[in-house]
Amino acid sequence: MKSKEPKEFVSSLNIIRDNIEKLSKVFPDTVKDGAVDVTSLLHHLGLTNDHDEEEFYNFTWKGKKEAIQSTQEPSEGTLRKVKNYGDKTTKNLFIEGDNFEVIKILQKSYQEKIKLIYIDPPYNTGKDFVYKDNYKDNIKNYLETTTQKDKKSKLSSANIDTTGRFHTNWLNMMYPRLSISRNLLKADGVIAIHIDEHEYANLEKIMNELYGENNRLGTIVWDKRNPKGDSKGIAYQHESILLYCKDIHEFKKKNAFKRVKENAGKIIAKANELVKTKGLSMARKELKAWMRKQDFSGGEKAYQLIDEKGKVYRPVSMAWPNKKQAPDDYFIPLVHPVTKKACPIPARGWRNPPATMERLLKDDLILFGADETTQPNRKYLLEENMFENVSSMIYYGGSDDAKLKELDVSFDTPKVVDVCKKIIEPICQPHDIVLDFFAGSATTAHAVLELNQGNQKQLNFIMVQIPEPIAKKHEAYKKGYQLISDVGIDRVNKVQQKIRKEDPENADKMDLGFTVFKISSSNIKSWSQNEDDSISITPQNLNEHCTEEDIIYEILLQRGLDLTLPIKEETIKGKKVFNVGDGLLYINSMNS
């Protein structure tokens, strides 16, 4: 049966229609014949037209209306497979194309499937680039530019302060991308964005508007320990990383949001070594001396004591933490094990109920003083407290020059892998997907691969990078890279090869592969859908030069199916068909 609306099939998710459907589920009577009854909606929200003339707090700029409208226009592009690297069954993707269009194209297939969006966008310093969107036909504009039909056109341009629209240009680039990418996040998903002082204030306002202030997780300050040399005022030596979750209630329900104490293993190993070689008494003194010399966090430095069993611990108060007094049974005295006399009780009572106190006594987790005059503390063993709250500070003054040199990859000012890992690790669980649509040299993918190697997180990544030409003066160009996306693809491939070589045992358990796609105009003019829900496409319905593989991936995108599903060629009743996802979808071959 031929579709009466072939155009609908060759576009991405219709966001306006999707939003209207969501609205109709909440307020059914506000949607009539597919249109929104604004008056009815205002009544449901407790608003009347009298409010129109009232003054509201609003963050706006020239072009904001067009930026919002651009998010509601579906893309008429698709993705075309270019090459597979490594594991054929990989779930990792590297997509070459304008990230705005790519995010639109992924709306159906990856809606609410991404756990972390992690981006490092242009900071708008006046030297970096800002993407130039053509809201009327962004796909046509992109393809004309990348095929150099107009050699004078550019994918992006330096956003210099003399344009008179310095902040406006940046806002018009960022707002629509941040808006539609939110749809891809899981309910408990998180977005993390690197930024410096140039646009921090504006980014915060955008994020509060799109995500809501109540969903803000906070700002992490990355202290680079190296002040900027070109500053005209205060010399900044830090960047900021803003974190917002999609739904704070879902996030808290499903995420502990704790990070591994980075140096806990070192502390335990040092204590074990000292006890073994110096004895318990000397080990206690030397551990404290050693800890004072280390650049550890405050939470880690608190663990500098060794108990009779050789275990590292810290003392913690057992006093009731609230201003109000604890219940009556929280005032039962603890008896000193030597003097057999009652120890002092905290003024507002103990922190724990009697049953917990009994268990702590039994497990030797209460610390008594020399006699009954000292109030007891609780013993926190380091081995049982290997996680800590995520700090608002990251101290890292190094670079990845050595890592990139080892891989023989060149790129100016990449993110630092170890910093990326500190952001990704406390947020993501096994099998989560990390999306970076300002991929650059693919540092985020590099960090994901190292996390997978180190703790078998089994994370997957989707990298998106516009094929921006590299200037001939740069070292990367001299090494043979013509596009920024070339650098990212080569880097990911080399990191995976390195892991295979250095860690063959774990390599077999990891997803060491990725598939490269690039953005393209649609292959399909019209389509036919059979009664059995399979799809038939005839050569007459196709654009020139497309392959069966191109058609299959476009159908997956239109059906909202994962691009990494297995595809097998089969023969059914003498006809060649493609079995997608082990029977999830059958596509008739156009050569049958």
Where are these regions (language model features)?
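DnaQ-like (DEDDh/DEDDy) 3′-5′ exonuclease domain used for proofreading
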Residues: M1-Y118, Y123-P176
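Conserved S-adenosyl-L-methionine
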Residues: W61, D133-N141, L171, H198-Y200, ...
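Segments forming glycine/polar-rich beta-alpha architectures that bind adenosine-containing cofactors
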Residues: I105, S109-Y110, Y118, K276-A402, ...
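Short, solvent-exposed loop/turn and secondary-structure capping segments
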Residues: L106, G126-K136, L203-K205, S231, ...
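Conserved proline-anchored active-site loop of SAM-dependent methyltransferases
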Residues: E112-V130, M207, V434-V448, L556
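Conserved Class I SAM-dependent methyltransferase catalytic core
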Residues: D150, S157-I220, I462, Q482-P504, ...
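Flexible, glycine-/basic-rich loop-and-beta segments that form/coincide
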Residues: K228-K301, K525-S526, E531-D533
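PRPP-dependent phosphoribosyltransferase catalytic core
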Residues: E450-S592
